[in-house]
Every structure is written in C-alpha cells, then in structure tokens.
Amino acid sequence: MTKHDHGLKEKVEGAIDKVKGEVKEVVGKVTDNKKLQAEGKWDKVKGTAKDTVGNVKEKVHEYKEHK
C-alpha cells in the first residue's frame, strides 16, 4: 500500500485481524482451549481498532479534499 492509501491499509489489516480472531476463537471453543479463545478475542479487538483508525484517516482525507 502506498503512503496515500487514506486508511485503506488499516482497514485491510483490521479485517484480516478480525477474521483471524474469529477463527481462533471458534477453534478455541471447539477444542476447549481458553488461551486460543482469548487470543481470538484480542485479535478481534485489534482488528476493530485498526479499522477505526482507517475510517478516521479516510474521513480526515475527505475533509481536507473538500475544505
């Protein structure tokens, strides 16, 4: 991704982290692995945070363009 991706990089990374977290959490539940479940929940939180950062960057860029 380029320097001027306007939050796209964070959005993609966030989506990947959320999917990865969901998989870990489900596998952790099926295998009764509490550590894996916790890692999955943490990955989903990280993904949501990255997605939020991406959205903010996008909005800032839009604001600057229409200023």
Swiss-Prot record:
Cited Gene3D superfamilies: YjbJ
The organism's place on the tree of life at top rank: Bacteria
Coiled-coil intervals: none
PANTHER family xrefs: UPF0337 PROTEIN YJBJ (PTHR34977:SF1)
Protein family: Belongs to the UPF0337 (CsbD) family.
Protein name: UPF0337 protein BCE_3655
Species: Bacillus cereus (strain ATCC 10987 / NRS 248)
